[in-house]
């Protein structure tokens, strides 16, 4: 089974110096389970100069949940409650050589597909005339359930779900009902 968690549009205008801080996604979301994926679809050519996503290879296997922080021009934790079960993310940028960081350039329509615990970030858009846009769609699988823990994004919480409940609802629609694998 597959549920739609939510979708989102990311835009980095030309000459945007601000980087997207290193983070993993799942701590931001009111969902728990291992089967949580992001698909980030390029709408424009994406290069390191325009702010391509960078990933730490294998970091989803760390099973570490890092404290969510505000994005954009703001700093700190002002939009997220502190959760004692989370840890602060290490200073990856200062220690880049300590990590196996990978990235790929994308043409419009190409996709990054990654686990919600994969640590990733992106540089600013240093291009003078090129906008960098990406459309992200997040899906959950069989083991994903609603999670009422502190520190998640307010817009992704639901008044219609209780802790541990399956996500099937108008808020998190079922998009693939079969639990067996394709081809089985």
What label would you give each PLM region?
Residues 24, 83-98, 129-131, 150-158:
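Short, surface-exposed loop/helix-turn segments at secondary-structure junctions
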Residues 1-56, 60-62:
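Conserved double-stranded beta-helix
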Residues 65, 69-71, 108-113, 117-184:
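Non-heme Fe(II)/2-oxoglutarate
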Residues 33, 41, 92-93, 98, ...:
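Catalytic cores of transferase enzymes with a strong primary signal for eukaryotic protein kinases
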Residues 20-32, 104-105, 123-128, 148:
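Short histidine-centered beta-strand/loop micro-motifs
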Residues 48-119:
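Double-stranded beta-helix
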Residues 24-27, 40-41, 98-100, 119-122:
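Glycine-rich, charged/polar anion/phosphate-binding loops
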């Amino acid at each position: 089974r597959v549920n739609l968690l939510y979708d989102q549009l990311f835009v980095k205008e030309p000459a945007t110096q601000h980087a997207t801080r290193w983070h993993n996604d799942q701590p931001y979301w009111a969902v728990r389970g291992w089967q949580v994926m992001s698909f980030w679809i390029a709408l424009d050519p994406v290069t390191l100069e325009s702010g391509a996503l960078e990933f730490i290879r294998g970091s989803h296997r760390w099973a570490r949940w890092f404290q969510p922080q505000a994005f954009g021009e703001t700093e700190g934790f002002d939009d997220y409650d502190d959760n004692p079960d989370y840890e602060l993310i290490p200073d990856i940028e200062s220690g880049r050589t300590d990590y196996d960081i990978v990235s790929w350039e994308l043409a419009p329509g190409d996709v990054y597909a990654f686990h919600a615990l994969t640590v990733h970030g992106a540089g600013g858009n240093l291009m003078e005339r090129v906008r960098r846009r990406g459309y992200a769609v997040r899906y959950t699988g069989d083991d994903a359930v609603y999670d009422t823990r502190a520190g998640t994004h307010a817009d992704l919480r639901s008044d219609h779900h209780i802790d541990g409940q399956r996500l099937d609802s108008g808020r998190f629609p079922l998009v693939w009902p079969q639990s067996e694998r394709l081809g089985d």
